[in-house]
């Protein structure tokens, strides 16, 4: 297992420039043919904030703040925006080998890089959304304290976990379409059971403990710690330790599945 870890880390380090270039190419492909191009990176969060504002202000007539911060910052910015990233990773990120078969069939191209550059391309979009949210919050007079400094660290943990997720499950999805289709059905349950639309702090302790093993819940809560709750995410050991445990499990699964199946994937595809 340690030999596989050394191999994967070595491949990603040796090919780091190619990984960055592939991530940028994948990002450009997303908006290729659009007249506004990269402006869509910021148009999407702007539209969602506008829609939520109209729905809450005139539809539900709800304007209650959360910890002194606008509800718009709590739900769409610190809840739905992280979900955009994770939703793509749950569905497409767990089946990247079928998404890029031309790279899989290249003899000298390491398969571990595919998960890395795909996750990186989505993380760039997420970073743009967070930057947009921060600018809008500051322009509207919302005070953001020193706890925002931990946001890059949260994004680093997001990157590590979802790369491991992709490496662990993509070989299985490449071999079995049934497994791939099963994973694609998980998007809706994850969305509704991860505290994106509601605050899980009111749950019974046992339910919160179970939810803490859900990586989607940890990401959403950690982003809200940065923007809303003004606390360091690593001081909440009841949620941080379970996340680290799940991260370790997926790293082990990723190394195991990669070692056993990476030679078979090109033949299957």
Regions found by a protein language model. Name each.
Residues 1-269:
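Hydrophobic transmembrane alpha-helices and immediately adjacent juxtamembrane helices
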């Amino acid at each position: 297992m340690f030999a596989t870890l050394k191999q994967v880390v070595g491949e990603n380090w040796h090919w780091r420039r190619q990984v960055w270039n592939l991530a940028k190419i994948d990002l450009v492909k997303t908006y290729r043919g659009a007249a506004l191009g990269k402006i869509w990176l910021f148009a999407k969060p702007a539209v969602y904030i506008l829609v939520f504002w109209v729905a809450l202000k005139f539809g539900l007539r709800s304007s209650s703040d959360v910890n002194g911060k606008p509800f718009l910052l709590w739900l769409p910015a610190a809840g739905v925006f992280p979900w955009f990233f994770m939703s793509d990773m749950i569905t497409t990120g767990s089946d990247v080998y079928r998404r890029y078969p031309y790279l899989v069939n290249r003899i000298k191209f390491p398969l571990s890089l595919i998960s890395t550059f795909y996750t990186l391309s989505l993380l760039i979009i997420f970073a743009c959304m967070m930057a947009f949210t921060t600018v809008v919050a500051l322009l509207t007079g919302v005070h953001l304290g020193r706890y925002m400094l931990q946001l890059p660290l949260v994004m680093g943990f997001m990157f590590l976990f979802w790369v491991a997720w992709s490496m662990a499950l993509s070989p299985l999805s490449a071999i079995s379409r049934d497994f791939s289709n099963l994973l694609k059905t998980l998007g809706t349950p994850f969305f509704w059971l991860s505290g994106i639309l509601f605050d899980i702090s009111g749950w019974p302790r046992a339910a919160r403990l179970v939810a803490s093993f859900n990586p989607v819940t940890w990401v959403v809560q950690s982003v809200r710690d940065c923007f809303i709750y003004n606390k360091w995410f690593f001081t909440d050991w009841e949620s941080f330790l379970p996340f680290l445990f799940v991260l370790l499990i997926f790293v082990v699964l990723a190394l195991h599945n990669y070692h056993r199946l990476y030679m078979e994937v090109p033949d299957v595809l």
